[in-house]
């Protein structure tokens, strides 16, 4: 169980503690879609 929790923690903590990173990823994704 600890391994699963450790693997899941970064997935849930990253968008919460680093929302600006998620915004950058969204911008890159939309930019990539527009380029394609």
Swiss-Prot record:
In what tissue types does this protein appear?
Answer: Expressed in basidiocarps.
Q: What molecular function does GO assign, one term?
A: toxin activity
Cyclopeptide (Val-Pro) cross-link, renumbered residues: 11-19
Q: InterPro entries annotated for this entry? A: Amanitin/phalloidin
Q: Which ranges does the record mark as transmembrane?
A: none
Source organism, top-level taxon: Eukaryota
Question: What about PTM?
Answer: Processed by the macrocyclase-peptidase enzyme POPB to yield a toxic cyclic nonapeptide. POPB first removes 10 residues from the N-terminus. Conformational trapping of the remaining peptide forces the enzyme to release this intermediate rather than proceed to macrocyclization. The enzyme rebinds the remaining peptide in a different conformation and catalyzes macrocyclization of the N-terminal 9 residues.
Prosegment location in residue numbers = 1-10, 20-36
How would you summarize this protein's biotechnological applications?
A: Amanexitides have a structure closely related to antamanide, a cyclic decapeptide with antidote activity against amatoxins and phallotoxins, and might therefore exhibit the same activity.
Cite the entry's keywords alphabetically. Answer: Toxin
Write out the function statement from the record.
Cyclic nonapeptide that belongs to the MSDIN-like toxin family responsible for a large number of food poisoning cases and deaths.
Name the family the entry cites.
Answer: Belongs to the MSDIN fungal toxin family.
User: Entry's NCBIfam families?
Assistant: amanitin
Q: What is this protein called?
A: Amanexitide proprotein 1
């Amino acid at each position: 169980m600890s391994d699963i929790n450790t693997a899941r923690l970064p997935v849930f903590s990253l968008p919460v503690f680093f929302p600006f990173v998620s915004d950058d990823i969204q911008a890159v994704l939309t930019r990539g879609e527009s380029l394609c």
